[in-house]
Amino acid sequence: MKKTPLLNIALSRTIAGLGHGDILVIGDAGLPVPPGVELIDLALTPGIPDFTSVLRVVLSEMQVERHVLAEEMFQAAPLGLIEVEQMHARGEIGQREVMNHADFKALTRQARAVIRTGECRPYSNIALVAGVTF
């Protein structure tokens, strides 16, 4: 059995297969997933699992070069933004790019996978761009 926090087989496999520049999206329960993009559905019920818990676990296994947020996340100020800001300040999620929500949804077409959480706070979405460990 694995010793790291991430136990979900599909998510673990996806992270292990990421290359430099690949995109992994963590989305709220309402974020649409484009046809052809893998959906890793973790949602059980509203709020479970929440956005920040999933983000923390993903970061335990993924090297992130930069991240992308929708500008609406700053306006709606979901609780997840507090944690994202702290991770950004600590350098855990690399450089930041901000775009409008429509462009963010278009970006998901380039993702290797979208992780659907049970998060129901609006705009609780982040695109993580894979970095390298060397």
Swiss-Prot record:
Active-site residue numbers: H20
Pathway: Carbohydrate metabolism; D-ribose degradation; D-ribose 5-phosphate from beta-D-ribopyranose: step 1/2
GO (cellular component) term, any one: cytosol
Keyword set includes Isomerase: yes
Binding site for substrate: D28, H101, Y123, S124, N125
Pfam families the UniProt entry points to: RbsD_FucU
An example molecular function term from Gene Ontology annotations: monosaccharide binding
Record's catalysed reaction(s): beta-D-ribopyranose = beta-D-ribofuranose
Keywords: Carbohydrate metabolism, Cytoplasm, Isomerase
Localization terms from the record: Cytoplasm
GO terms under biological process: D-ribose catabolic process
Main location: cytoplasm
Keyword Cytoplasm appears in the UniProt entry: yes
Documented EC number(s): 5.4.99.62
Role: Catalyzes the interconversion of beta-pyran and beta-furan forms of D-ribose.
Subunit structure, interactors included: Homodecamer.
Membership in a protein family: Belongs to the RbsD / FucU family. RbsD subfamily.
Protein name: D-ribose pyranase
Protein species of origin: Pseudomonas entomophila (strain L48)
Lineage, broadest ranks: Bacteria, Pseudomonadati, Pseudomonadota, Gammaproteobacteria, Pseudomonadales
Gene: rbsD
